[in-house]
Design a protein with these regions (language model features):
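Active-site-adjacent structural elements in enzyme catalytic cores
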Residues: 1-118
Length: 118
C-alpha cells in the first residue's frame, strides 16, 4: 500500500512501539499515525529536520481545514504562505483531506475517507 500511495494523501495508523512517547497520542498511546507528504516543500523540510511529530490543521473532532483562509480563521496566530507564494511553490489544494486507515485485526479499517481510495 505504501509503495502505491506514498508519498501522498494517506495516513496510516499503526501499532506504536515502546519507543514512541505516549504524549504523541494521548487518546490512544498504543497507536501512531504516519504520513509521507507528497509536496516538495514539506519533503524539503523533512529532509532537513528528519521526522516531525505534527497534528492536522483542525481542532480535534472537527472537520479538516482545507484552505489557508480556513486555517487562518481558526488559528489566527499561525503563519501561512500568501496566495502568491503558494502559487510560486505550486501548492495546489485537492480540497480533500488525507485518507486515514488503521491496521487492526489483520486488516485495514478506513477511519476517514479522503483523497486516496483503498
Amino acid at each position: 500500500m505504501t509503495e502505491k500511495h506514498w508519498p501522498g494523501s494517506l495516513t496510516l495508523v499503526l501499532p506504536a512501539s515502546e519507543k514512541v512517547p505516549k504524549v504523541l497520542n494521548p487518546k490512544d498511546p498504543s497507536t501512531i499515525g504516519i504520513r509521507v507528504p507528497a509536496h516538495a516543500i514539506a519533503r524539503e523540510i523533512l529532509g532537513r529536520t528528519g521526522v516531525l511529530a505534527t497534528t492536522s490543521a483542525n481542532l480535534s473532532g472537527q472537520e479538516p481545514l482545507l484552505t489557508p483562509e480556513a486555517i487562518m480563521t481558526t488559528f489566527p496566530s499561525v503563519t501561512v504562505l500568501a496566495p502568491t507564494e503558494r502559487q510560486a511553490w505550486g501548492i495546489i489544494n485537492s480540497g480533500q483531506p488525507s485518507t486515514v486507515a488503521r491496521w487492526q485485526c489483520q486488516r485495514w479499517d478506513i477511519l476517514r475517507q479522503g483523497a486516496v481510495f483503498l
